[in-house]
């Protein structure tokens, strides 16, 4: 792989107008897009937070984007020194920062309601629920794998390339940097040790789009037509996400009283090393302000360390032999492992998280049971359509019904239903579920 092709591909106008680059336009278009705004009411870790200081997917994405911009600019500055031909075609360190920042902004765009539990709930419906298992023989093996392994990354790529969001029209480098897992769901011989093979990044419905993207940017092929090496900047996107959720989840947990201030301070101090000055910290009034300062300094340290690892492994990144998370090789990796262990025990398994996650299975499973059955019978088995199912189908948004009636395959129909359900915010999903179950009706008290 080479940087000139990786940063331009077949895009004819990557520099854009004089006021902003095409990559900066990517960022702006994402910010003003409807799918991005929906992240405001989607779970990060603590579902449906009542406290306004706990992160949602929206605030998390903005913070990851900020960290990604710094990583991109730091890496870009050094890459330009090594490859002056990039300067000759007008590439700057700000272009690296803009690409990574825009890709980071979209990294959670495909996540369903209720966080990662939402992914499990959707997958579980098709793999375990009779209403979902019904579709097994009506789709191909590859399509079935897409359904029983719902993947937010693949859903995000679908959203970013969906014709209904034509206003996005993101550049190829941004789309590729977004794709952390450049492979399809069903792979006969996955390379288990490769980080980029752990999940998948596109559905069968978008397979041709990714294949064209990979060819345009010159991504190295691992499995013809099925799996590729990552775009190098995807490693920086992943690192920005890792940095933010490891540290900011801990900060949120401390604010909510799930982790003590002393334990949180000790872990941040381990990351900061000589830069931790306890006397300075004591002069800051308020727990939230003290923890916020420690988090800010720690993020800066991890940015420097991740950028260094990325640059040290440039040859291996470009030839496709490097395929690890940057945070796994930084000096602070052992302290990060401790933070992850504490987060699993005290945050992700806390009662408030587990209660809402269990509810997420009920809500999403219930919505899918009703909407998939009603849509299938409306399109493919009208005689079997019950009055209740006809009412459920009519409750779908008009835009969804219009799209559904144009579909000719069961897989395409299911993808449209999943687009709708996974795109719901947490509160909207709960509200629709209550109405369909008759526990919340207009005009009733």
Where are these regions (language model features)?
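Intrinsically disordered or highly flexible coil/loop and linker segments, enriched in small
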Residues: 36-40, 131, 165-169, 184-188, ...
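A short small-residue
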Residues: 42-52, 342-347
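Hard-cation-handling environments
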Residues: 275-327
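Substrate-recognition/cap regions that form aromatic- and gly/pro-loop-enriched pockets
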Residues: 312-399
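C-terminal amphipathic alpha-helical interaction region
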Residues: 388-439, 445
């Amino acid at each position: 792989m080479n940087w000139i092709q990786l940063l331009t591909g077949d895009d004819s106008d990557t520099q854009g107008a004089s006021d902003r680059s095409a990559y900066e336009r990517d960022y702006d278009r994402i910010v003003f897009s409807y799918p991005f705004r929906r992240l405001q009411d989607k779970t990060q870790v603590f579902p449906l937070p009542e406290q306004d200081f706990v992160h949602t997917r929206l605030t998390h994405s903005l913070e990851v984007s900020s960290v990604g911009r710094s990583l991109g600019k730091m890496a870009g500055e050094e890459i330009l020194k090594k490859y002056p031909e990039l300067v000759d075609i007008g590439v700057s360190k700000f272009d690296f920062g803009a690409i990574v920042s825009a890709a980071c902004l979209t990294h959670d765009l495909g996540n369903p309601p209720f966080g990662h539990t939402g992914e499990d709930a959707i997958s579980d419906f098709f793999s375990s629920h009779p209403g979902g298992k019904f579709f097994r023989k009506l789709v191909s093996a590859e399509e079935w794998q897409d359904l029983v392994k719902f993947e937010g990354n693949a859903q995000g790529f679908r959203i970013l390339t969906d014709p209904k969001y034509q206003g996005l029209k993101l550049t190829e480098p941004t789309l590729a940097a977004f794709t952390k897992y450049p492979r399809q769901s069903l792979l006969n011989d996955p390379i288990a040790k490769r980080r980029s093979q752990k999940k998948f990044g596109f559905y069968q419905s978008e397979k041709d789009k990714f294949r064209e993207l990979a060819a345009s940017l010159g991504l190295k092929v691992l499995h013809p037509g099925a799996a590729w090496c990552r775009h190098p900047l995807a490693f920086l996107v992943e690192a920005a996400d890792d940095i933010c959720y490891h540290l900011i989840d801990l900060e949120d947990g401390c604010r909510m009283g799930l982790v003590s201030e002393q334990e949180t301070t000790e872990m941040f101090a381990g990351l900061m090393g000589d830069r931790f000055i306890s006397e300075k910290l004591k002069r800051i009034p308020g727990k939230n302000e003290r923890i916020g300062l420690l988090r800010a300094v720690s993020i800066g340290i991890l940015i420097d360390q991740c950028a260094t690892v990325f640059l040290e492994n440039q040859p291996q990144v470009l030839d496709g032999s490097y395929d690890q998370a940057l945070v796994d090789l930084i000096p602070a990796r052992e302290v990060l492992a401790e933070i992850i262990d504490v987060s699993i025990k005290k945050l992700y398994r806390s009662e408030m998280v587990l209660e809402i996650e269990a509810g997420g299975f009920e809500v999403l499973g219930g919505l899918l049971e009703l909407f998939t059955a009603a849509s299938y019978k409306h399109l493919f088995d009208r005689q079997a359509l019950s009055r209740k199912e006809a009412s459920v189908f009519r409750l779908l948004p008009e835009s969804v019904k219009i799209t559904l009636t144009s579909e000719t395959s069961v897989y395409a129909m299911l993808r449209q239903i999943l687009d709708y359900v996974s795109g719901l915010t947490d509160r909207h999903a709960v509200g629709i579920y209550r109405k369909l179950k008759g526990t919340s009706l207009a005009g009733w008290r």
